[in-house]
Curated annotation (Swiss-Prot):
InterPro entries: GrpE (IPR000740), GrpE_coiled_coil (IPR013805), GrpE_head (IPR009012). Coiled coil: none annotated. This is Protein GrpE. GO terms for cellular component: cytosol. The gene is grpE. GO terms for biological process: protein folding. One of its GO terms (molecular function) is adenyl-nucleotide exchange factor activity. Belongs to the GrpE family. Homodimer.
Length: 179
């Protein structure tokens, strides 16, 4: 019952919008009638162009929102993978000495890391550059240290790698900075 009422209201509203506005021609000359009709035509043409422009703007906004939603989903997924890549990189730093099995495991871990990095690049994700000067937009200084080898403000050591996805910081790089 409620559905029928809603549908009838929608149809009534549509019919009102489609009903032509009546133009009163009583007592008007032919030239005045033509002028009145031209005014009405111009008014309706303007309404049409405005409605069409609004529709195009809505389409563009919808497409942008759709890509933003997909990008946000990718960011969340990528953020969840960061601890995995961190753990693999810690495992890759293990020194196997002369143990052949450990060397093979390390080689497998390095291959896995490279596959992760290729996948990250494919989806617009990359490591934050940590060579050179400290940049508060992409680096997080967790330590200030004295260093003879580095000038003040230069990155001395990377504690944790940072990542950017599609131009946005996913996780800042945690670094130590020279005094």
């Amino acid at each position: 019952m409620s559905e029928e009422i809603k549908e009838q209201n929608v149809q009534d509203a549509q019919n009102e919008n489609l009903a032509p506005d009546s133009v009163n021609f009583d007592g008007l000359s032919d030239a005045a009638k033509v002028a009145e009709l031209e005014n009405k035509l111009n008014e309706l043409t303007d309404k049409y162009y405005r409605a069409n422009a609004e529709f195009e703007n809505i389409k563009k906004r919808f497409e942008k929102e759709k890509t933003d939603i997909a990008s946000y989903a990718n960011e969340k997924f990528a953020r969840d993978l960061l601890p995995v890549i961190d753990a693999l990189e810690i495992a890759a730093n293990f020194d196997p000495d002369d143990d052949e099995f450990a060397k093979n495991v390390k080689e497998g871990v390095l291959i896995t890391i490279n596959q992760f990095k290729k996948c990250f690049e494919k989806h617009g994700m990359s490591e934050i550059d940590t060579s050179g000067e400290f940049d508060p937009n992409v680096h997080n200084a967790v330590l200030r240290v004295d260093s003879e080898d580095h000038t003040s403000g230069q990155i001395v050591q990377v504690m944790q790698k940072g990542y950017i996805i599609n131009g946005r910081v996913l996780r800042p790089a945690m670094v130590s900075v020279a005094n």
